[in-house]
Amino acid sequence: LKLYLNLSKSLNAKVKKLLRKTARKAEQEYLKYNDMYYFFLEDFSNDFYKILSSHYRSVITATSERLIKQRETKQEDEIDIIVATYIADVTANKVADISQTTRNQIKQAIKIGIADGLSIPEISKKIRTNRSFAPYGATMIARTETHSAMNYANYEISSQLGLNRPIKEWNSALDDRTREWHRTMNGTTVAREEMFKVMTPIAGGGFIERRMSYTGDMNGGALNVINCRCFTLYYDSEDEII
């Protein structure tokens, strides 16, 4: 938990700083052109990619080294492969998704501002204070990305630990913020290579089965990943929990 908190705190500060800078650039762009061409998003995407890539490397390395030390094995070379794979598979898509969300929210803010008869400076201010750049957004990103990267590292390095019959167990936070369907998953065990089957609520009622390799697995969708605090435990069927 301490490792998770320290790592997410570091990313939180960096993302908040980037969002403040990006908000100012977006405001200035609209003031300059009386329109929005989203030039600011190019700088944002490049900076965000660098921040996330560096963070993923730090998270996965720290998590993997801790697990390797606990098992008294030497798999340092594997860590570099795990890091490179995660950065390649996740970072670009994550940056693109958040950039597109930002574009859509600003476009909506401009549309509403024009409909309300606001002046260019007033709309520019609305852009700067748009929820895309809100501090809570940085906190959500920091928590979610740190959590997913840590769980990914645990999942990947668990295959290198020489376990005879590797088991994984879903471990939930179990407090008043825990999703009810994650509370139900608490203590669920499956073989490492199998998928957790998470019955996830859908709009309009009912549930859909989401298959996840580990807690925080992006395949579970936003409802299972954003701000999730569950962790996966890995151990041999005849071993103590690690």
PLM region descriptions:
Residues 1-132, 233-242:
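N-terminal leader/targeting and assembly helices and adjacent pre-domain segments
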Residues 137-242:
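Acidic, glycine-rich two-metal-ion catalytic cores of nucleic acid-processing enzymes
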